[in-house]
């Protein structure tokens, strides 16, 4: 059975957010674009919250988990529409699983046809996934993760990947404030609590976000 806890999505989202901001800055994008990428980073997997609810409601249904996993970018895109986020943020989220060689999803876009925000998120998302513990494996070290990504570099924009290597080894990264995203996350926590789906770690979810981004 699939399970995506809100705690896991918050932590992963913040890690991707900060890396996306730093990578955009390393690539020379203006501050506003870097900030927009930080928003997209923290929300890029928000569709998994919807996915969790759907799968948990289908307790007796046998599902092909990968098929459902691959719907999360579209679910996230749809969830965030009408909430005041820019087209840039929404498209970055929708296409963050597209591979540079055209083998990704949901639209099999390739090369420059993939929005540059999505290309940035792709790199940061993969790195954060590799350097995090999973039920079936321990986290890879920074060096191991970069080696694995280099072996699959066809999936990434090469210029961005080289810039990402510089970011990872710079040692000058720091967390940034995203107060409007903070409010959305709090809304989702509130909705899940009211619907009786609150995790036992729910309080720590909010505390983690507040500590990393300042008081609301």
Protein language model features and the residues they cover:
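Histidine- and acidic-residue-rich, metal-dependent catalytic cores
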Residues: 1-212
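Short, low-complexity N-terminal regulatory "tails/caps" that precede and couple sensory modules
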Residues: 215-216
């Amino acid at each position: 059975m699939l399970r995506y806890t809100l705690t896991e999505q918050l932590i992963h989202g913040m890690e991707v957010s900060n890396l996306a901001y730093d990578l955009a800055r390393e690539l020379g994008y203006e501050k506003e674009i870097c900030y927009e990428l930080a928003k997209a980073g923290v929300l890029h997997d928000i569709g998994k919250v919807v996915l969790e609810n759907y799968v948990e409601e289908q307790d007796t249904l046998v599902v092909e988990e990968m098929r459902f996993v691959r719907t999360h970018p579209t679910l996230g895109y749809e969830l965030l529409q009408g909430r005041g986020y820019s087209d840039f943020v929404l498209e970055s989220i929708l296409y963050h699983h597209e591979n540079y060689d055209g083998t990704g999803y949901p639209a099999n876009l390739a090369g420059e046809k993939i929005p540059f925000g999505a290309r940035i998120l792709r790199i940061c998302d993969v790195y954060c996934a590799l350097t995090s513990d999973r039920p079936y494996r321990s986290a890879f070290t920074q060096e191991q993760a970069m080696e694995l990504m280099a072996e699959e570099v066809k999936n990434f924009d090469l210029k961005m990947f080289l810039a990402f290597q510089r970011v990872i080894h710079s040692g000058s990264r720091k967390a940034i404030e995203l107060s409007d995203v903070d409010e959305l996350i709090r809304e989702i926590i509130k909705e899940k609590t009211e619907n009786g789906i609150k995790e036992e770690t729910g309080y720590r979810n909010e505390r983690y976000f507040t500590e990393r981004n300042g008081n609301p």
